[in-house]
């Protein structure tokens, strides 16, 4: 049976070594597998859910992310790389799916709850951010993805997608939507620590070694890295 894989990144900043170890390296391997079709999305619409006040940041980083993809070995002749906003049908499908999901169900997503807390939204949660797991479901099902690689923290998102698929097929009594399988990282998979030693390498914390960094930038960052005095 052939596999259809959907994955991607939000263009909120340049990609770093943590992205390479965590997902990009695996995508390059997947594109070379037999009977595997892979779609990689630059999720600019999703990036706007918490960057609506700075759209230029998102626009500028679309190109940066695309260049990073090519630099690590993603081959456009083997992998379909696309920009989310260039396919308006995804937003349309998201609107239909929103009618199948209750507010209480959205509240129960532990990943979204944690992200809302981390971003300190308080009571001012953007509706687009609160509902972005539904948008992800639209992206996944539109391409009839059979497998979706995610980290442990993103597992609740895929569970939400699977619920939407089951509900849609049950309500309309047709197996129209494909139920995607979750691909989790290996148990020994390690996250890279940021150069400041304060948690994982992160775009938002600006503590990464970026794929586009110059040799001098990399050397300077390595020399300043936090090390255990013991």
Question: Where do the model's predicted regions map?
Answer:
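Active-site cores that bind ATP or allylic diphosphates and position pyrophosphate for catalysis
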Residues: 113-230
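N-terminal Rossmann-like or analogous alpha/beta NTP/dinucleotide-binding catalytic cores
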Residues: 3-138
């Amino acid at each position: 049976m052939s596999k259809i894989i959907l994955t991607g990144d939000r263009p909120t900043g340049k990609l770093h070594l943590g992205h390479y170890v965590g997902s990009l390296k695996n995508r390059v391997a997947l594109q070379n597998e037999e009977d595997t079709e892979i779609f990689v999305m630059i999720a600019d619409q999703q990036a706007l859910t918490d960057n609506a006040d700075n759209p230029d940041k998102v626009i500028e980083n679309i190109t940066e992310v695309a260049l990073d993809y090519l630099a690590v070995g993603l081959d456009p002749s083997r992998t379909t790389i696309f920009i989310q906003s260039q396919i308006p049908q995804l937003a349309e499908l998201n609107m239909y799916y929103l009618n199948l999901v209750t507010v209480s169900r959205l509240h129960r997503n532990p990943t979204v709850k944690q992200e809302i807390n981390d971003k300190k939204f308080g009571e001012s949660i953007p509706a687009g951010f609160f509902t972005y797991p539904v948008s992800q479901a639209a992206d996944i099902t539109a391409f009839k993805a059979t497998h979706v690689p995610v980290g442990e923290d993103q597992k609740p998102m895929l569970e939400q997608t699977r619920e939407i698929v089951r509900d849609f097929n049950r309500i309309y009594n047709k197996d129209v939507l494909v139920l995607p399988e979750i691909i989790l990282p290996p148990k020994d998979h390690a996250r890279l620590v940021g150069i400041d030693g304060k948690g994982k390498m992160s775009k938002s914390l600006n503590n990464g070694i970026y794929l586009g960094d110059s040799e001098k930038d990399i050397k300077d960052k390595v020399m300043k890295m936090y090390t255990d005095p013991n």
